[in-house]
């Protein structure tokens, strides 16, 4: 798997109630995500606005309101699997697109993607680029805020200060 720096724009649909914390990975830490165990903060972004919407809606036509935000990302150590599994990698990575929610929440089985996340942590990377399972051709980026280097940059683009500053905006 390639590990390289990224300098790109990324997108995320924010739940309005929590849009005052656009850089928080706490939501994913609460129950876990495809590439993070419960308790591990992770920020899931997409490289295309359409992919961000598809991921937020889980590809369903009827979904809750969201706020689309753009992020500027400069991270030195990101693993890349934009094209999916490559046979030269550890065979564990074949399961990157497993139905992790079904495995964990319904069957009570730890998804193999959490072991992959452990490998990423041991490799010292700050994130992973991977194909979207909700939008063919789309690419996602998971970042681990606790693992970003001091020189890494992650900023939400909000030049006019339109995102709320506290949850009080939604009461």
Predicted regions and their residues:
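Extended catalytic/binding region for NAD+/ADP-ribose chemistry, centered on the ART fold
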Residues: 33-63
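Active-site and NAD+-binding cores of ADP-ribose-processing enzymes
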Residues: 1-30, 34-37, 62-171
């Amino acid at each position: 798997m390639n590990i390289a720096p990224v300098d790109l724009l990324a997108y995320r649909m924010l739940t309005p109630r929590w849009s005052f914390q656009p850089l928080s990975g706490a939501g994913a830490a609460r129950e876990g995500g495809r590439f993070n165990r419960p308790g591990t903060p992770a920020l899931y972004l997409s490289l295309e606005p359409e992919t961000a919407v598809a991921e937020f809606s889980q590809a369903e036509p009827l979904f809750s309101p969201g706020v689309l935000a753009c992020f500027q990302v400069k991270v030195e150590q990101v693993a890349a699997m934009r094209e999916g599994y490559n046979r030269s990698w550890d065979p564990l990575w074949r399961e990157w697109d497993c139905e992790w929610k079904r495995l964990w929440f319904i069957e009570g089985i730890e998804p193999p993607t959490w072991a992959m996340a452990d490998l990423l942590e041991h490799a010292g990377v700050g994130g992973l680029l991977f194909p979207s399972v909700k939008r063919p051709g789309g690419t996602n980026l998971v970042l681990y805020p606790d693992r970003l280097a001091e020189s890494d940059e992650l900023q939400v683009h909000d030049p006019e200060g339109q995102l709320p500053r506290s949850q009080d905006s939604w009461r």
